[in-house]
Amino acid sequence: MACSIVQFCSFQDLQSARDFLFPHLREETPGALKRDPSKTSSWEDDSWGAWEETEPREPEEEGNTSKTQKNSWLQECVLSLSPTSDLMVIAREQKAAFLVRKWKHGDKGKEEMQFAVGWSGSVSAEEGEYVTSALCIPLASQKRSSTGRPDWTCIVVGFTSGYVRFYTEGVLLLAQLLNEDKVLQLKCRTYEIPRHPGVTEQNEELSILYPAAIVTIDGFSLFQSLRACRNQVAKAAASGNENIQPPPLAYKKWGLQDIDTIIDHASVGIMTLSPFDQMKTASNIGGFNAAIKNSPPAMSQYITVGSSPFTGFFYALEGSTQPLLSHVALAVASKLTSALFSAASGWLGWKSKHEEDTVQKQKPKMEPATPLAVRFGLPDSRRHGESICLSPCNTLAAVTDDFGRVILLDVARGIAIRMWKGYRDAQVGWIQIVEDLHERVPEKGGFSPFGNTQGPSRVAQFLVIYAPRRGILEVWNTQQGPRVGAFNVGKHCRLLYPGYKIMGLNNVTSQSWQPQTYQICLVDPVSASVKAVNVPFHLALSDKKSERAKDLHLVKKLSALLRAKSPRPDSFETEIKELILDIKYPATKKQALESILASDRLSFSCLRNVTQTLMDTLKNQELESVDEGLLQFCASKLKLLHLYESVSQLNTLDFHSDTPFSDNDLAVLLRLDDKELLKLRALLEKYKQENTKATVRFSEDADRVLPVKTFLEYLEYEKDALSIRKIGEEECVALGSFFFWKCLHGKSSTEEMCHSLESAGLSPQQLLSLLLSVWLSKEKDILDKPQSVCCLHTMLSLLSKMKVAIDETWDSQSVSPWWQQMRMACIQSENSGAALLSAHVGHSVAAQMSSGATDKKFSQMELDADAEALTDSWEALSLDTEYWKLLLRQLEDCLILQTLLHSKLSPPAAKAPSLQSEPLPRLSVKKLLEGGKGGIADSVAKWIFKQDLSPELLKCANKERDVENPDEPREDLLHLAYEQFPCSLELDVLHAHCCWEYVVQWNKDPEEARFLVRSIEHLKQILNPHVQNGIALMMWNTFLVKRFSAATYLMDKVGKSPKDRLCRRDVGMSDTALTSFLGSCLELLQTSLEADISRDEVQVPVLDTEDAWLSVEGPISIVELALEQKPIHYPLVEHHSVLCSILYASMRFSLKSVKPLALFDSKGKNAFFKDLTSIQLLPSGEMDPNFISVRQQFLLKVVSAAVQAQHSKDKDPSAEAANTHWKDLNWPGLAVDLAHHLQVSDDVIRRHYVGELYSHGADLLGEEAIFQVQDKEVLASQLLVLTGQRLAHALFHTQTKEGMELLARLPPTLCTWLKAMNPQDLQNTGVPIAATAKLVHKVMELLPEKHGQYSLALHLIDAVEAMATL
């Protein structure tokens, strides 16, 4: 109940705004930069704390000035905060930062408000102009649904050039030049409901102070103009048209005279003098000849501070009314018309951009100012005023000067009524507090309207003074009251007092909604926080006889007593009773009792005795003087304390249930046969094994007693009914454990506990909610103690028999809300084992009560022969029974699925990537019902991805067990899931979800190429071509085509296989991953082609759902989306497949001088990367021979590279091991297929393949490949050359004596031909001569006898045979 200062907002990154406005401060922080350069842009990284710790103690040391400058930077800025706390402006010179409000979750789970930089930049449009003042004005909404509430906030900025510009979040709305001098100050006044009928209603206005003039803009005109400009800016941004003329603006302009300098001003508003004051003023100025009118004139009052006079009072007549004095009227009558409301001229062009592009050279026309002389002032030639702050009710004003004084002015009388000294560079503001009628105490024997709770509320004003030199914030009671609060806040803060609220309200809209606006706040740059000052109303009433002050003293004394380190047990309780009984005010007494009950240092008996004593004292008083609210509060707390005592006693009693418990008893209790009970036990045992985790448990946690303080926080009495507050899940578990945990273990009497709770007034529904929260959260302990099921059955039966648990009018053909509450708790629980057990217990109790009710009903009737049949049919037709059966099936399915998802492979194959090590979320029936038809398969697919199971293993797990396959528990669980979900986990559906899951995870980390490879493997396992085609098409469009096109353009640009850096930059993966990616794309396109061929032969599958999950809702499944896909256009997919093969071959073999797109004409290029289901114009007819030649050269390169990679002797074993998935591809065969699509002769490719095989010494493979060649004569000529190269190498490079002799015996023709051969073209020169002889004979077979080289071949045979004998 004392004055306080509370933080209500913080800054997300204030240091970045400081660095933007003060770049030199950022450069002067070498210490912070050396510590961690990456953390210099965030105030959250302890940079402020580091500076505070290193602050020099002696002011003479170096660095103290630098630190002060870094912390006091806010004093040099223009600062403004919107009254609705949604926008803040920090400006300096030509720059400004607009900070917007954001909400984030704090450490305690509550939302915290923060200011973050929403826009920053330069706001100056003319050269050399600086920001001098700024305002954030919230504008009221005009919508019916939000009348009176803030719609948006306008930022008004004044400049040294005289311009006033209006912004909204960085967008310039309009700009106005009203005077050529610089803007000194901007102030705003919004509408306030008059407190008394005689008070003049003030209009809204924006006042702009210049060195010798003051301009006031009418609030209604400004409001309409800003709304129109904002709408036009939005239209201009949408249409691109910026040539829109802003609407006109009405204003008044007064030239202030007879004053030297003006620093600040206050616009008091319209005032009317009383007849006495009117005559007094006329007599003092005009003498006895002064004439006055019958009705006093209305005048606008302005107060300025500066020098000569120190404070000046100006009065401007409103409308055409006569001035107060005749000669004054003569002086201003000729000029009065110029100050009437007129349309503002000279609007500048505005734009919907952050900055203006150009500034118009021509200055707008200036309206002349109407002279306004100072009527009187406070003359003080040595004193210079610095600021003036008007009170909320316009009766007082606080003025600061250069002498360190704060002067309090009476605005109406124009006199100084109080002065404070010792406040140099002070910042002031006001707080207006309205009295709370509920805190009033009736006055004894008085007839004051403020002596009862029905009178009008009083209003108190407090002056807030911030002295930055001393770092202190003080709150003073006005006018002559004492200081009521003082706080040490630091020396670098800024005190913000806007003095206005929301613009655009009137006497009707201002009453529809009370805006949440602050009156005054303190911005602390050191702690990066915004704090509000709270002052209770009663501080305005404090005097020597104040009972309130005495009560506050007693409350402080009580707080100190509760915080005492070593309280005296003997007198502690007595002192507390005396203190609380001495307090007079009921509200303060209630506050004291709340602090006592919230203390965790007092024993339960002390709390009970203190509360009981206060209760007895109140009952002994007279009824008229007793506060009913306090009496009810004490009674409710006593009831809660008695309930706490009774529950604690029941939990401490030595109670043990001697009833034996067996499996047969459990089966009878749950109404299950032996087979069903065994199945339930087996499921729970598997679930328990898979969900076992190594956790540390403390014995005191289970038996920990709920503190009485926490107990009182959780419960409350409302209208004589005990209810549970809105608390979190953990709090519900704690409260439920306090009530039921001992009962569930058989250590406390269940009947007595239920009776105590029911007698206290807790409803059965709340007790059921607590019971289930405990049961479902303590799953591990419950599964270890099966006897707790019996205790739950007993507890649930007792709760169900309470009076308001089950409605007596409930019909079996309708759903019981009682049982529906229990079912909903089981549906939402993620602990499937505990939920399944509780559902069995609930089903059993519901059936028991239903049978009992049926027996009771039929016992009152005459039974006939069919009575038993009627009873059976009654139970069978119960709607709740059907819902229980459905829930049991769903929970059993969820339990099996949960067991599977938490099972782990042992041992782990290898270190799993981070994506595969992420834990899977726990399941609940609700999640499965909201997950759509594919939710179950999607969950299993995530588990398969996490375990990295092969598609073959999924197929094996779906088969029946046989002797050959070993029993593996993980496969057993998967097989059990298949049996439980025959529709949701159908193999095609599961493979489709696995395929999608792998490609989604690959997209998160493209470097994991094996994820995409595994995705394609699952895609190939899908049997239905409709599903296969749809999944492939979705994968291509969603994840692959963008990267595929990027890879194509990159390879075409560089003309070879790109390096790793380029691949990462353009495609987002390494060169190795890109190679694998292209191979996977090729397999996907080929799979799509195969699926399209068999589409017409297979029907579209019908997707079924298990009976228990027919009510599933949620997103459409992957398989359903796949079936909605259109059929592919086969030629277009084939066209992409050709391109993919080219790219894959180029990357696989690192081919150079290859531009993939150069192999296609314009039609072929235009068809790439289009929708695979669309019909595109593809190349047809004869191709240009130049294209064919380039294609043929590429295919020959591929064949050569493939043969070399396969048969080269200098292979890299590590690279070969890393690229094992590339060896399966038949590259020569693929080259032949490509030759068919590229219109290249496939026989040329086959002949080249045979030649490459023989060149590498693979003669056996070459002999097999010869059979596929069509033109064997040309092949024989090519092989003859290769034979000559082998012989030339053997004869000329060995140069043995026998070889030279043989060479001399050869025919001259053959010798000349061998010398012309180049053996360097051979890839393998170590081929045995016998293999070469065999090759010559093969050439002889292929060459016809009439061939020109036939005789040469005969000579070769002789030469080879001769060499074989050497």
Swiss-Prot record:
The keyword Aminoacyl-tRNA synthetase does not apply. The modification Phosphoserine is found at residues 38, 448, 914. It comes from the Eukaryota. Residues 43-63 have a biased composition (Acidic residues). Pfam families: RAB3GAP2_C (PF14656), RAB3GAP2_N (PF14655). GO terms for biological process: positive regulation of autophagosome assembly; positive regulation of protein lipidation; regulation of GTPase activity. The modification Phosphothreonine is found at residue 899. One of its GO terms (molecular function) is enzyme regulator activity. Its main location: cytoplasm. Residues 30-69 are annotated as: Disordered. The keyword Ribonucleoprotein does not apply. Keywords: Cytoplasm, Endoplasmic reticulum, GTPase activation, Phosphoprotein. GO terms for cellular component: endoplasmic reticulum. It is found in: Cytoplasm; Endoplasmic reticulum. Belongs to the Rab3-GAP regulatory subunit family. Regulatory subunit of the Rab3 GTPase-activating (Rab3GAP) complex composed of RAB3GAP1 and RAB3GAP2, which has GTPase-activating protein (GAP) activity towards various Rab3 subfamily members (RAB3A, RAB3B, RAB3C and RAB3D), RAB5A and RAB43, and guanine nucleotide exchange factor (GEF) activity towards RAB18. As part of the Rab3GAP complex, acts as a GAP for Rab3 proteins by converting active RAB3-GTP to the inactive form RAB3-GDP. Rab3 proteins are involved in regulated exocytosis of neurotransmitters and hormones. The Rab3 GTPase-activating complex is a heterodimer composed of Rab3gap1 and Rab3gap2. The Rab3 GTPase-activating complex interacts with DMXL2. Interacts with LMAN1. PANTHER family: RAB3 GTPASE-ACTIVATING PROTEIN NON-CATALYTIC SUBUNIT (PTHR12472:SF0), RAB3-GAP REGULATORY DOMAIN (PTHR12472). This is Rab3 GTPase-activating protein non-catalytic subunit.
